[in-house]
Each structure stands twice: as C-alpha cells, then as structure tokens.
C-alpha cells in the first residue's frame, strides 16, 4: 500500500445545503498505513451555523441532521466497496486545524484557534470540545440529555471498512455525496 504523508490531505468541497465539508485522512503517526481514520473537518463558519456554544465546554447540537446524513452516506458507500477496518469521524473546527501530537495512549490530539478535539481512543472515537488548549473536557455526548446521546455517539463514532490508499479519491470522484 502506498504511504501517504499525513500533511497530504484529500480535500473537496461538498455542498450539502448547510455549508462546506473538507475531507482529510490520517492515522497515528506520519503516514497512512493499514488502518486509518477518515475525518470530516467542518469549517468554523459551518460550526456556528450548526452548533450553539453554551459555554466553554458544553455544546448543543443544532440542525446537525445534514452533517450526519453526509457521514452516513459516506459510510454506506465505503462499507460496500472496501474491506479494511477503519473509522469515520466528524471533527468540528476551522479549516486550518493542525495535528500537534500523538500520545503514548494513541489519542490523537487536534488543536486549532478556538476548539480542541481528541479523536481515536482504542477503537472508540470521541468528540471533545474546549477553548482551553491545555485541558481536556468531558465527552460531548455525556453533557447532553439522554434523547440526544445516541445521535451524538453516531455523529462521532462511525466504524466502516475502506482502502486507505483510494477511499477518498473514489468517494469524491463518484460524487456520492
């Protein structure tokens, strides 16, 4: 399998009625090898269009069905076409998000100007939100009411199967979204 540098992200603009979604792919380390993560990075403007910030560490879902639908369509397509285990996650933040470090616990820490998301923890993907770069807040879904928890779990954790080398190019070229 061809190794792809972590900085070489596959990006495409997907108009879905709610805004623009950028595609990226990366794994724990400098290259994409074997299992990987396909991360939907939502732009900062789309974040404010679809989410309502209550305070520094609590976020309420607003009109998230559109973003969720995009992830679902992608997962359905990839699960049919490919056979390698991976995970699709949704990460909210600005488009200039940078990967800062990968800890020994294999937790991928992603930080941008305002928000911090920690993704990928032993096969389970969580979404964390914080305005403090030095602290990790509680998982988002634990802050919501019971009726919202299942939605957020699916919104943040989406296991599928795909071929790391070709998945993004195929999805975008076929314009399945």
Placement of each model-derived feature along the sequence:
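DNA polymerase processivity clamps
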Residues: 1-177
């Amino acid at each position: 399998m061809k190794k792809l540098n972590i900085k070489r992200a596959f990006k495409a603009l997907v108009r879905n009625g709610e805004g623009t979604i950028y595609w990226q792919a990366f794994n724990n380390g400098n290259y994409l090898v074997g299992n990987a993560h396909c991360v939907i990075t939502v732009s900062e403007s789309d974040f404010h269009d679809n989410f309502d910030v209550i305070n520094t560490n609590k976020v309420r879902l607003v009109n998230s069905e559109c973003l969720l639908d995009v992830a679902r369509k992608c997962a359905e397509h990839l699960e049919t076409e490919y056979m390698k285990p991976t995970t699709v996650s949704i990460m909210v933040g600005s488009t200039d998000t940078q990967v800062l470090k990968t800890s020994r616990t294999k937790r991928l820490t992603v930080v941008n100007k305002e928000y911090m998301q920690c993704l990928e923890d032993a096969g389970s993907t969580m979404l964390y939100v914080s305005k403090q770069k030095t602290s990790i807040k509680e998982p988002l879904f634990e802050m919501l009411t019971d009726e919202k928890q299942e939605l957020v779990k699916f919104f943040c954790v989406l296991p599928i199967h795909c071929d790391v080398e070709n998945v993004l190019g195929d999805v975008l070229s076929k314009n399945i979204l």
